[in-house]
């Protein structure tokens, strides 16, 4: 049986990389409030880890309305499901320890070495390869010039304030692991002490960060792909969402894929957009 777990702190926990990591209170509250989110994508016959106190009635209603073949599993019940296959929102040392401590068999959990490899694959720096891919293949309607990875041994002397001078509109520094707009440092008014301190922490904790120009962004959306586990990667749809002026996630726009494609054609010809999507799919398939 598969056991689905919604842990929205997955990317932040990867950045911390400690098994005793504790997410901020707001993220912990989100995990509690949305614990049943996996019922909408869980395979039939699976369990979803959540508290029964305020989730049981809601799940019962959804089961009656939509004939969902999923059931609730609480934390104290984990020893009864020791041989499950855990399906978290994202793996990291903290969720591994939580499942192990709860009673899941260690053989059913990823090893520390596997988590290290997963962490490197999840690093934001991997996205820089796509910039080079689009550049060398001369793909129209793409941007990304000026994005780079800053690596060092943790000493602030390894990065010069002059590095930001080439960006007329300023630049943004991004942690290698973060989510929902966290882990961003905006440099709009020169290399201030706050920016310098942020860079020092990023170099010390993660040995690097990504630097990008501040683009004249219109809106946000994402392409979503699914790996079938047998070497095939499929495009499954779009996600259109909203962020604030600091890049923090604020919510999603409920819309169909067709409506997203109609919207995007205001800015990019559809044929060019499909070429970009297809190249992304092929590159992800090769790189996974």
PLM regions and their residue ranges:
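N-terminal-proximal low-complexity accessory segments that begin disordered
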Residues: 1-47
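Gly/Ser/Thr-rich loops at beta-strand to alpha-helix junctions
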Residues: 9-12, 53-57, 90-97, 177-181, ...
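Well-ordered, non-membrane alpha-helical segments in soluble/globular domains
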Residues: 24-36, 124-133, 156-158, 192-197, ...
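Conserved N-proximal alpha/beta basic substrate-recognition cap immediately N-terminal to
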Residues: 27-43, 49-158
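A charged, amphipathic alpha-helical module
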Residues: 147-185
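Glycine-rich phosphate-binding loop of ATP-grasp-fold ATP-dependent ligases
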Residues: 170-195, 222, 245-264
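Phosphate-binding site of ATP-dependent enzymes
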Residues: 195-248
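ATP-dependent carboxylate/phosphate-activation module, predominantly the ATP-grasp catalytic core
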Residues: 227-287
């Amino acid at each position: 049986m598969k056991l689905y777990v919604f842990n929205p702190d997955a990317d932040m926990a990867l950045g911390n990389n400690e098994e005793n990591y504790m997410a901020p209170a707001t993220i912990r509250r989100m995990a509690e409030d949305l614990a049943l989110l996996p019922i909408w994508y869980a395979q039939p016959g699976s369990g979803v880890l959540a508290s029964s106190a305020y989730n049981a009635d809601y799940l019962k209603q959804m089961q009656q309305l939509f004939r969902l073949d999923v059931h609730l599993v609480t934390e104290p019940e984990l020893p009864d499901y020791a041989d499950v296959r855990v399906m978290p929102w994202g793996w990291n040392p903290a969720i591994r320890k939580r499942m192990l401590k709860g009673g899941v068999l260690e053989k059913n959990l990823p090893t520390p070495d596997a988590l290290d490899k997963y962490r490197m694959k999840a690093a934001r720096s991997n996205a820089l390869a796509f910039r080079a891919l689009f550049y060398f293949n001369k793909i129209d309607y793409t941007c990304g010039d000026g994005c780079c990875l800053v690596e060092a041994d943790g000493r602030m002397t390894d990065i010069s304030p002059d590095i930001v001078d080439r960006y007329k509109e300023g630049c943004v520094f991004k942690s290698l692991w973060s989510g929902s707009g966290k882990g961003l440092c905006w440099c709009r008014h020169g290399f201030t002490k706050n920016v310098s301190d942020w860079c020092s922490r990023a170099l010390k904790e993660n040995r690097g960060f990504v630097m990008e120009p501040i683009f004249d962004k219109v809106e946000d959306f994402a392409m979503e792909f699914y790996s079938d586990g047998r070497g095939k990667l499929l495009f499954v749809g779009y996600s259109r969402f909203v962020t604030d002026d600091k890049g923090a996630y604020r919510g999603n726009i409920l819309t169909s894929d067709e409506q997203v494609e109609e919207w995007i054609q205001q800015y990019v010809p559809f044929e060019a957009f499909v070429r970009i999507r297809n190249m992304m799919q092929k590159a992800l398939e090769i790189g996974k």
